[in-house]
A protein has these predicted regions:
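Outer-membrane beta-barrel domain signature
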Residues: 19-23, 56-61, 102-106, 143-149
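Short, surface-exposed loop/helix-turn segments at secondary-structure junctions
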Residues: 95-103
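Conserved long hydrophobic alpha-helices within structured protein cores
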Residues: 27, 80-82, 105-115
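Hydrophobic, lipid-facing positions within transmembrane beta-strands of outer-membrane proteins
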Residues: 28-32, 66-72, 111-117, 152-158
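Gram-negative outer-membrane beta-barrel transporters
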Residues: 1-94, 138
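Short glycine/proline-enriched turns and hinge-like loops at secondary-structure junctions
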Residues: 62-63, 99, 126
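C-terminal beta-signal and adjacent terminal beta-strands/loops
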Residues: 2, 39, 89-96, 108, ...
Length: 163
């Protein structure tokens, strides 16, 4: 229970937020986690589920009431592959426009898939890593006040370290 819940209000059109006192608000719910690994740890599965009840969803901005995250990991020698599924219910937040009017905004539920492939090598005192990842592979994008959210992205990373 919160007696003086502070929430951030986004000023429309600029990257500025300011706090306001929302007053009384409460949040309850539960989180659950499940994990399974093969004996040799070549395969791992983990799943998380969260469910929340809000006295007022606008008091807890951008907080979904339901979240599911599943992750499958395969490890074979130097390679590791992660496959990730994330699902979140709709989210709400408050913004204010240039005339001072409060706007109640809603982001639709999301359901995304990500993948990451990494290679780790060791040679004497050197360690190297290469990873390639893709986010939001199903390309479900959202737009908020002209700003694109959850875009499909690809990353290639290299790392080298020496003892």
């Amino acid at each position: 229970h919160y007696s003086n819940k502070i929430k951030q209000v986004q000023l429309t059109g600029v990257p500025i937020q300011f706090p306001i006192n929302f007053g009384e608000a409460s949040l309850s719910g539960f989180d659950s986690n499940l994990s399974f690994s093969s004996k040799a740890e070549l395969f791992n599965f983990s799943s998380s589920y969260a469910y929340y009840l809000f006295s007022d969803p606008m008091a807890f901005q951008l907080q979904p009431d339901k979240m599911v995250r599943n992750k499958i990991t395969f490890k074979i020698r130097w390679f590791q592959l992660n496959l990730i599924h994330r699902s979140e219910s709709d989210r709400q937040f408050t913004s204010i426009n240039s005339t001072g009017t409060f706007l109640h905004n809603r982001l639709d539920a999301i359901n995304t898939y990500d993948a990451n492939l990494s290679l780790k090598l060791k040679f004497r005192d050197y360690k190297g890593a290469i990873s390639f990842s893709g986010k939001n592979l199903n390309n479900i994008s959202q737009e908020l006040n002209g700003i694109s959210l959850y875009d499909q992205r690809y990353n290639l990373n290299f790392g080298l370290s020496w003892k």
